[in-house]
Amino acid sequence: MDLQLLYFTSIFSIFIFMFMTHKIVTKKSNSTPSLPPGPWKLPIIGNMHNLVGSPLPHHRLRDLSAKYGSLMHLKLGEVSTIVVSSPEYAKEVMKTHDHIFASRPYVLAAEIMDYDFKGVAFTPYGDYWRQLRKIFALELLSSKRVQSFQPIREEVLTSFIKRMATIEGSQVNVTKEVISTVFTITARTALGSKSRHHQKLISVVTEAAKISGGFDLGDLYPSVKFLQHMSGLKPKLEKLHQQADQIMQNIINEHREAKSSATGDQGEEEVLLDVLLKKEFGLSDESIKAVIWDIFGGGSDTSSATITWAMAEMIKNPRTMEKVQTEVRRVFDKEGRPNGSGTENLKYLKSVVSETLRLHPPAPLLLPRECGQACEINGYHIPAKSRVIVNAWAIGRDPRLWTEAERFYPERFIERSIEYKSNSFEFIPFGAGRRMCPGLTFGLSNVEYVLAMLMYHFDWKLPKGTKNEDLGMTEIFGITVARKDDLYLIPKTVHN
């Protein structure tokens, strides 16, 4: 009898224990906010199958968000990923909770090429980032500093225009010419006078950009280190890094020697390398090289892609090109010659650049952010260490936000006052908040001035047999999203 009583007592105790445990777990589960909605996850790969077969991830993510919501959860390999596709949620990430989402996730290419995250773009949020950001804002790329580079821009653009004039009436690869010109401007403003090293560095930057775009398996499975080698990306990046490091170190050494010797160019304008070498900043050579790499990578591809997209859109919309040419020629003729300060009066040209960036942001998914600590957004749980992707391209083409969203219509930026640095999160081609692109002023100055010179000096048309409306606008995805096909046009000189 005692054994039977003990048996039933034990069974009853186990039942009570299991019942209470279930209630506690259920209560805890109900009190914890759920993750944002998203497609069904498969074991091991998560949602990677949802992106397979799409060469343009920003398009595929827009389509998935239309089904699951503008705050969407994906599991890409091992990485918990939050996709933001509306200005309301973009504001939550880049303003309301900006301090939580101010860091960057692990990216293999940034670790290798950026000297273990020593550049401003991918360095973790903290004191070192604050130091770099302050140097960028107050010294490196301030409005005053960017204006001081105007003589360099004018010199480079004058050579470019003369070269175009000599081949008037012939077919020109505008894409190639613009890339070369913008890289040259960047090299001269960052490193100083023409150097035998400039073209070598440009070649390495271009090659690194080609192989670093898109999602890499090593980034999606950070705990499985051998995948970095299996994909072949790591050894390729390490080889390019060695080349870039040697080139940039030679440039730094030669710059130091030139400045310390009597043969140095005493009359030259201070360039970005001069600023970085100032002793009061206390930057190591590795930090300086990482920043130079960021300036080349972030300031050249993006600007040249934007210029080429703008030219293509104006060719498809001749009325827009005519309005830009009329404005540019009126303003510059009044001032006697083309100059950088005159671009401030080119309101319509600026609206063309804004409309180009709305439809074709060079980094459509911006740079990824990382959630520093678990938080809630609109009742949804965002786990710590989640990678956050903001689809600026989808926001810029959302028909709920923009009338005739797919139409190229620069006048919308004259009719509505929307600025790059405003609190309007429906237009964020440069990001927003703490991690907003620090090179915004530098990049826009280059884009606006190059376009102004192209519109002032030349009329442009497509090669014979190609109609404006048939011009292809297909994208190719990479670190920067550019036109898939090079743009070929025929210039006709208007102003020598």
Curated annotation (Swiss-Prot):
Its cofactor is heme. InterPro entries: Cyt_P450, Cyt_P450_CS, Cyt_P450_E_grp-I, Cyt_P450_sf. Gene3D superfamilies: Cytochrome P450 (1.10.630.10). Induction: By fungal elicitor. Keywords: Heme, Iron, Metal-binding, Monooxygenase, Oxidoreductase. Heme binds at residue 437. GO terms for molecular function: heme binding; iron ion binding; monooxygenase activity; oxidoreductase activity, acting on paired donors, with incorporation or reduction of molecular oxygen. SUPFAM superfamilies: Cytochrome P450 (SSF48264). Its EC number is 1.14.-.-. Belongs to the cytochrome P450 family. This is Cytochrome P450 71D9.
